[in-house]
C-alpha cells in the first residue's frame, strides 16, 4: 500500500456509564434492561455452541471496528483484549489505495473486500483470480466483456476502475494482511499463556468478517508456523461465524436466571 492512510482508536467504556444507559433505555421502552457481561466472555459462550468445540479455546472476533481475542482455560478463566481496526479499516484502505469513486466508495470497497475477482475474457468464459477458467452456457452481458468483475452470489458485478485484476487483488490482500493478520497476531499474543501463541492449541473465528472468503485461509497459513489450529465457528451449528455474542448473551442470561 502506497497511498492509503487510516486511523482507528479504541474507546474505553465505563461500567457506571453503561448502567446509566441501561436505566435510560429501560425507562424509554418500559422493559427491564440489564448488562449482559463482557463482550469477550459472551463471544466464547456463543462459540462453544459450535459442534466439536471445547475449552481450552481461543476466539478471534473479527468485526467491523475492532479485532478482539479471548482465551478460556480449562478452569473457566477468561483473558481478553480489544484492538482497534478490523473490517471497516480494510474497506477504507482499499478505497483510498484504489481511489474508488466517492459516490459509491464504501459499498464497492466492501464488495471488493468480500468477493473474489475475475476477468471477463469472452461472452462465454471468465478467468478467475486463481487463474482457473469458468465457462457459461448462456452468453454474458456484452457490457461485461473485457472488464474486471466481482464473483458474487447474484452473478458478476463489474468494477468501475482502470486498475488491473492483479493490482486490485494485491491491494485487497495487503490491506487484510496489514489489518486482520497483524491485529490477530497481536491480540492472540496478548491473551496467550506466557505471551506465546504456541501455547494456544485451537482458535475459532467469529464475527462478520469471518464470512470473508480468504481471511481464515490467510490466518491458517500464518498460525501453522506456531502449530496452532484455526477454523471458522458455526454458532448453534447453523449460523456460521455470526451472532456469537448475541448467542452468548442469551446463554449468559439463562445461566444467571437459573442461579437466582
Model-derived features with residue positions:
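Nucleotide/phosphate-binding catalytic cleft detector across ATP-hydrolyzing
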Residues: 1-56, 104, 119-122, 128-178, ...
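Short, contiguous, pocket-lining structural segments
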Residues: 9-17, 61-63, 82-86
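Contiguous, well-ordered alpha-helical segments that form the cores/surfaces of helical PPI scaffolds
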Residues: 42-46, 68, 92, 96
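Gly/Thr-rich phosphate-binding beta-strand-loop-beta motif of the actin/hexokinase/Hsp70
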Residues: 51-78
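A short acidic Gly-Thr/Ser loop motif
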Residues: 59-67, 84-87, 207-210
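Short acidic (Asp/Glu) and glycine-rich catalytic loops that position anionic groups and cofactors
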Residues: 70-75, 86-91, 160-165, 227-229
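Glycine-rich phosphate-binding loop plus the immediately following alpha-helix
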Residues: 76-121
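Catalytic-loop motifs flanking and including active-site residues across diverse enzymes
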Residues: 86, 90, 180, 245
